[in-house]
Amino acid sequence: MLGGIIGGLTGNKNARLKGSLVLMRKNALDINDFGATVIDGISEFLGRGVTCQLVSSSLVDPNNGNRGRVGTEASLEQWLTSLPSLTTGESKFGVTFEWEVEKMGIPGAIIVKNNHAAEFFLKTITLDNVPGHGAVVFVANSWIYPASKYRYNRVFFSNDTSLPSKMPAALKPYRDDELRNLRGDDQQGPYQEHDRVYRYDVYNDLGEPDSGNPRPVLGGSPDRPYPRRGRTGRKPTKTDPTAESRLSLLENIYVPRDERFGHLKMADFLGYSIKALVDGIVPAIRTYVDLTPGEFDSFKDILKLYEGGLKLPSIPALEELRKRFPLQLVKDLIPAGGDYLLKLPMPHVIREDKKAWMTDDEFAREILAGVNPMVIARLTEFPPRSRLDPARYGDQTSTITAAHVERGLEGLTVQQAIDGNLLYVVDHHDHFMPYLLDINSLDDNFIYATRTLLFLRGDGTLAPLAIELSLPHLQDDGLITARSTVYTPAARGGTGAGAVEWWVWQLAKAYVNVNDYCWHQLISHWLNTHAVMEPFVIATNRQLSVAHPVHKLLLPHYRDTMTINALARQTLINGGGIFEMTVFPRKHALAMSSAFYKDWSFADQALPDDLVKRGVAVPDPASPYKVRLLIEDYPYANDGLAVWHAIEQWATEYLAIYYPNDGVLQGDAELQAWWKEVREVGHGDIKDATWWPEMKTVAELVKACATIIWIGSALHAAVNFGQYPYAGYLPNRPSVSRRPMPEPGTKEYDELARDPEKVFVRTITKQMQAIVGISLLEILSKHSSDEVYLGQRDTPEWTSDAKALEAFKRFGARLTEIESRVVAMNKDPHRKNRVGPTNFPYTLLYPNTSDLKGDAAGLSARGIPNSISI
């Protein structure tokens, strides 16, 4: 049988084309055991179940609008079971086409019809040997629903790459039709599961006004600008016509069907896991907390989460939930009957040493090599100044003085340290001060706005010099001023006041980390990766054909993003969702992120530009990456610049194949429509910003594509996969502070002297919030077993262009070299920021391109997936 397929031709050599089709049945994604091979039900695809028609790329049919000639329908034949290239759940079939090349030309597209009652996932169709041309591959990677669900034919192009002007005339109408279908501008919704419509909407589905839990609409107004999300077309709420109605937890929010996981991916499981957490485990935790004192008393109490687990009481909701979830893996999350044992893995930051996180060295190291290493900036004026409007906030210049810091400057004056590029700041003061009156009026909240000054020592490490904690003060005249206190490092040891002051300093660092945790989750992570990326996904599908070179370049970096963002709107960032439950701004959180989006700049997302803007690097044409780091041992920047450079080289080489000059780019109608829509619609609330590239030069396109790839891959990896390893241990990165700093002469200060650990853990995130938040971080921080990493593609036949394939191979080789470089730097004892007191090496930007077996699955804290995937 295989010989006949591979030989490819029988009978009249020019009248028949043989090939094969690879698909996955719907229930292949619902199997209980991901390792199982599903072989039942294959026969349903044989006969007339699935039909295919070839479309000519070279000869037109004058009776069909001069479209490419369409061949007769061909049905699937043999089920080819023995080919080792098939992965779990895939089925491969033979197919024979009646097609005479002399009369019909070279096939360039194929029409596929599903005559079943259920959908299937079509991966590829391959023609083995087209006379005079060789093999032709059609890459689909698309769900095919029954033909009755569509108003149009499902058409797939060969894997040739074509600018609109180079598309064969016979195929151009099909290309235009496909984009029109995906835009769906004439379809208002509500969209159904099978729909493929990519349209925009504002964030108006986070609240539930009908239940008395509204949230402001984000996007579409100067006051609350926001990136757009994918439209669902759901009906408005009854009480607020501007708000979209919400779905129950077990219903899936609409995203275009091919954006929903079409692969055997842990993300399906993770999606269910999050829903299980929200709907079942959270109530169980709440019940547990109600039945116990509900507080941690010591670090030892917190360690029990990892060493022994917590026995949660059995509640009926858990058993009901267990029945409703399909996957066995999720059923295992929710055991039947008895107590539910919640046991979490030991976070990396305390695996080697349970106390090293408390050192100033580790606190400072995580600013450069932690989960939020993109906030630190060089201090250029002393004391630090606020940029808040003085008409509303008065003068909020920092109260840190030279006397506070000079003992830690290794003999230098403040000015000498500034002139030597040795003073740095993590400045969250302006980020939070405008919101603290509202935030601190919420129960169990006592949040400071913080500034942290750091000194770059001779050995390349940072030392914290001072922490300023500020609270807002509303004056009679309406002015909101700051009341600030400055804290400086205290040595451990001793008795009496000295011992207490060391704990005061530990609390000061905790208040800083509370600020940083929120900024990381809300801005560095959600806004600056997830939210800003979705408009690019939508615009690419609406305006760039799958045959367009830029579509082929960017597609891997969009995988799962819309689905994950929809899941976030449903369970994480919605009103009353896990984010509001566990992070201090609570109901104000997403509205705050809208205010910060006003200052977001696409141009600043390119890593070299970001580093220069923060003053931690300076332009340097002689440096390999055109910038020179002022903090030489800055793991995020060291690894990030190498990865950025590899991405930029790849984009440069790839795009040069299709755009030999700026004129070709300017004449590319699809590309120009794409960029116009990104700017004017997807990010329309900031369309007038002067930093937007005009997209008139190939250099602008290279930079834009490199930036999009960077955001979806490396930037997201840097802020996502270290969440549990660093913040899974609550005291290291708490999400809330509940009490003010104890002052000398108060009973709170005396309590700190008596039982400092108890005061510390009672000051930070309470037990209920902590367990829920940490449980979520564990889910979000895992790599899936079938992760596709930077420098890999899930479909080897993604293009027929040999030059593009060679450039991609070089890209992968560069990334593999970076892996070796990261390993070597982590072993270099002179690079003290790479590993630090916790003995936890920085590998978040280790590309993992060389891993073809899924070795980095789970909580590995290493690897850069192509896209924003949990």
UniProtKB/Swiss-Prot annotation:
Give the protein's recorded name.
Linoleate 9S-lipoxygenase 2
Pfam families for this protein: Lipoxygenase, PLAT
Cite the annotated pathway. Lipid metabolism; oxylipin biosynthesis
* Cofactor list: Fe cation
Broad class of where this protein is predominantly found: cytoplasm
Indicate which residues the UniProt annotation says bind Fe cation.
525, 530, 716, 720, 870
- Assembly notes: Monomer.
Spell out the SUPFAM superfamilies in the cross-references. Lipase/lipooxygenase domain (PLAT/LH2 domain), Lipoxigenase
What does the cofactor section's free text say about binding? Binds 1 Fe cation per subunit. Iron is tightly bound.
GO molecular-function term, one example from the UniProt record: metal ion binding
Q: Where is the composition biased (Basic residues)?
A: 227-236
As for subcellular location, the record says:
Cytoplasm
Q: Which family does it belong to?
A: Belongs to the lipoxygenase family.
Instruction: Provide the function of this protein.
Output: Plant lipoxygenase may be involved in a number of diverse aspects of plant physiology including growth and development, pest resistance, and senescence or responses to wounding. Catalyzes the hydroperoxidation of lipids containing a cis,cis-1,4-pentadiene structure.
- GO terms of biological process kind: fatty acid biosynthetic process; lipid oxidation; oxylipin biosynthetic process; response to other organism; response to wounding
Superkingdom, according to UniProt?
Answer: Eukaryota
Q: Where is this region: Disordered?
A: 203-243
Q: What keywords are assigned to this protein? A: Cytoplasm, Dioxygenase, Fatty acid biosynthesis, Fatty acid metabolism, Iron, Lipid biosynthesis, Lipid metabolism, Metal-binding, Oxidoreductase, Oxylipin biosynthesis
Gene Ontology, cellular component aspect: cytoplasm
